[in-house]
Amino acid sequence: MAFFQDGPELGNTWAGDRALRECVRRLLPSEVLAEVEPDLERLGERAAGEMLALAVEAERDPPRLVRLDAWGRRVDRIETCPAWRRLHEIAAEEGVVAIAYERAHGEHSRVHQFARLALYHPSSAFASCPLAMTDGAARTLEIHGEEELRERILPRLISRDPEAFWTAGQWMTERTGGSDVGDSETVAAPDGAGGWRLTGSKWFTSATTAEVALTLARCEGAPAGSRGLSMFFLETGMAAGALRGIRVERLKDKLGTRALPTAELELDGVPARMVGEPGRGVPTIATVLNITRLYNACCAAGTLGRGLALARDYARRRRAFGRPLAELPLHLETLAGLAAEHAAALQLTFRAAQLLGREECGVASAGERELLRLATPLVKLTTGRQVVAGVSEVVECFGGAGYVEDTGLPGLLRDAQVFPIWEGTTNVLALDALRAARGGGALAALEREISGAVEGSGVALLAPARSAVRECLAQLVAWHSLASRDAREALEAGARDFSLGLGRTWAASLLLSQAEWEARGSERAAAPAVEAARRFAATLGAIPVPRAASPGAGATRDLALGGAAEEVRAPALR
């Protein structure tokens, strides 16, 4: 068959992503930017070349579980391909984790790190996933770890030397527990020598080749529920080539992230050490979750940016109706909408990274610390929804080619679906956002930030956008105030709409700040940022207003469960 169409090509991912570049330029001081930007451009070239080729190879050669050796001994060895292992080495070389702990640029180190992560992730075949947990474990050991762990383990988790670099797992999900971690069944028994032995099942572990892990378990005799859980550190045995008290039951056959080994594990007397106080496992491991959720947001924004880059390039190559797609007004509208969503996701992510950096360096105000607590679930849940809708639109931009596996585009969509699931689903995070808003301090801090952003007046075109943000914020704050006085069911029922509305309203305000900042240099050069802010703010009118009525009233329940209460019968379990 004759050749008929050029496929999309990927250029330097730093040079080609204006929204990312300008966001980072606004947040970093000029002297820091001058130091790090050349290296970001170099990484952007590496991501589009060497790393992309490795990622394609890793996707084609997924991990395998070898249960037995040639002599029948059970070894439970997970084999990954050379390309996957090389991507891990590149992460160490590029300091994707290390930068946050070297803190060469103080409070700005997290922004620098997240810029690197946004470039690294889309060409990593999800090697970024173990990095998220490694970063979270490093911070947890930095805060809560005993001196021996800080001296022996922490340097490996933040090393730039591929030979010394270790990754860490975060094993929380169990068959019964899931998001309800208080239902976890793993038990910790004293080993008689000051340590512990863990026994239980971990149903979903995504860093199964990690050298170390943090996990939750219930000490013998501890009370039921989350308050009975403690956090433990363990060495898997991977560093020595053989698992210690761990059986790999199977690798998961997943919708996406297929290069990433994900497994069900059985813990059978695994040696472990408690980290933090007994019964404080959930608050202690929250340090990991706060970081992995922001990684999730950054990787979601990066994935959306990758899809947008491919769609933009294809629009210049593909001709339809006698013209390139890039000259068709309706296609340009579609791409512009995607670009606005991508810019919004970046703004949310990097504002959270900025807050995290300030908190870690001890310079955050009390209000900023409260804001970070609310930002973490808001940013994760908002970007998780954005990337699924956005990448679905990207696939559609390619027509039938987007539905063909060997273009690689269906894999982009499959992978995107993980972002609203990993590290807490939308509903779980919406409830967490409600908890963060309890007491009013965090919500008041966010309200002040958004209100401050809409006070700008330098760009006349943004006046309608500022009004839209003010109106949406007022509605959301008013709903929260009223619902907080109502029954708990009403507050929970509206949590999703409230959190998504708040996240998108915040994103719109950040886009306004970005556009105003760019316009100070040149209104003409700021045109893309102004248009992104204008377009995104226009979507706020479509945000559902949270319902104040309790679903227990009946109608919501009947609709949700498929009939009147007396008609709904659960199927018998067999």
List each language-model region with its residue ranges.
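C-terminal catalytic subdomain
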Residues: A416, P420-G458, S499-E516
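C-terminal helix-coil-helix/basic helical segment that borders enzyme active sites and/or dimer interfaces
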Residues: A343-K380, E396, H480-A493, L512-A527
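Extended, charge-enriched "interface" segments that sit outside catalytic cores
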Residues: M1-G106, V568-R574
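Internal maturation/activation junctions in enzymes
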Residues: G145-G194, F350-R369, T376, V387, ...
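C-terminal amphipathic alpha-helical interaction region
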Residues: G452-R574
